[in-house]
Amino acid sequence: MIQTEEMNQLKADALADISQAADEKALQDVKVKYLGKKGSVSGLMKQMKDLSNEEKPKFGQAVNEVRQAIESAIADRKSVLEQDRLNKQLEEETIDVTLPSRSIKLGATHPLTRTIQEIEDLFLGLGFEIVNGYEVEQDYYNFEALNLPKSHPARDMQDTFYITEETLLRTHTSPVQARTLEKRNGQGPVKIICPGKVYRRDSDDATHSHQFTQIEGLVVAENIKMSDLKGTLELVAKKLFGEEREIRLRPSYFPFTEPSVEVDVSCFKCGGKGCNVCKQTGWIEILGAGMVHPNVLEMAGFDSSKYTGFAFGMGPDRIAMLKYGIEDIRYFYTNDVRFLDQFKAVEDRGEA
């Protein structure tokens, strides 16, 4: 029978080897050496067959105590080695939080979006309310409520996308004005702008699109005059195109305003002397406007003898083309990164 001293020596040797294991692989080798099928502890168990029945229990208990001590020491050492490995990994992967971060490539505000926001901010500063409406609209609000009955010849001026006989894609944002007036139950004042997409059956080319944006404005109150319209539009022109700009009003025709005017701004490129932008005229057309037709007020429940108003409509697409020298409206809608990247520089410089 193996002596107790020798068994204790085996245990001491195993514990020494475990404590000296430098990594998890070395520890695994120690485990195999002592606890494997051909290991030292397994070799002790083979001696059981040579012992008497009285000796076997005590011997087996002693061997199990050695095995448990070795297993416990291996588990403790493994935990230490795993923590050391983790600490080393963390040390190697330490991030210096004082270093500058990697730059992220940022886009820029779309030139059309920037123009719309600029116009909206301008009118908000003048006390206007922004009102949105339906893009799929009823024929009544798109035409009839705006002094365009079904038999009116001016309907031919706008080729329309009809969904059903009485439902269509709006051809302007004027239906928002009609609905707003109707909701006010004949009580002023009303001071709104209506931005949004509109649709017409145009053939797409450099200056036309079947879908484009429009911003219309409406003011209805007592004693509103043509001079109020002119003063408002002069301010808008100066804010959008420069303080030195002037405007001129030319007689025109719109079914929902009377009188109606086309509004031109003095050319911001040549200062009115004549160039390719203004086609040598010194003036650039920017919007249409006029005094709200009494029929429109009456159909919405307003007393036209008490209330008057003015309305105007502008195309942000055209204004953006003029401001940024864009020659083709289709550039706004094709999402060409080469085109859009140009406006990142404009935004970085803080230009409008």
UniProtKB/Swiss-Prot annotation:
Question: NCBIfam families of this UniProt entry?
Answer: pheS (TIGR00468)
Q: How is the cofactor bound?
A: Binds 2 magnesium ions per tetramer.
Q: For this chain's UniProt record, which GO biological process terms are given?
A: phenylalanyl-tRNA aminoacylation
Task: Report the EC number(s), separated by commas if there are several.
Answer: 6.1.1.20
Q: Where in the cell?
A: Cytoplasm
Q: How does it assemble?
A: Tetramer of two alpha and two beta subunits.
What are the GO MF terms of this UniProt record?
ATP binding; catalytic activity, acting on a protein; magnesium ion binding; phenylalanine-tRNA ligase activity; transferase activity; tRNA binding
Residues the entry annotates as binding Mg(2+): 258
**In its UniProt entry, what is this protein called?**
Phenylalanine--tRNA ligase alpha subunit
Catalytic reaction annotation: tRNA(Phe) + L-phenylalanine + ATP = L-phenylalanyl-tRNA(Phe) + AMP + diphosphate + H(+)
| Keyword Protein biosynthesis attributed | yes
Return the broad EC class.
ligase
- Membership in a protein family: Belongs to the class-II aminoacyl-tRNA synthetase family. Phe-tRNA synthetase alpha subunit type 1 subfamily.
Q: Name one GO cellular component term.
A: cytoplasm
* CDD domains, sorted: PheRS_alpha_core
Q: Which UniProt keywords apply?
A: Aminoacyl-tRNA synthetase, ATP-binding, Cytoplasm, Ligase, Magnesium, Metal-binding, Nucleotide-binding, Protein biosynthesis
> From what superkingdom does this record's organism come?
Bacteria
Q: Output the InterPro entries linked to this UniProt entry.
A: aa-tRNA-synth_II (IPR006195), aa-tRNA-synth_II/BPL/LPL (IPR045864), Phe-tRNA-synth_IIc_asu (IPR004529), Phe-tRNA_ligase_II_N (IPR004188), Phe_tRNA_ligase_alpha1_bac (IPR022911), Phenylalanyl-tRNA_Synthase (IPR002319), tRNA-bd_arm (IPR010978)
Heme among keywords: no
PANTHER family tied to this protein: PHENYLALANINE--TRNA LIGASE, MITOCHONDRIAL, PHENYLALANYL-TRNA SYNTHETASE
Q: Which cofactor does it need?
A: Mg(2+)
The organism named in the record is Staphylococcus carnosus (strain TM300)
Matches recorded under HAMAP family: Phe_tRNA_synth_alpha1 (MF_00281)
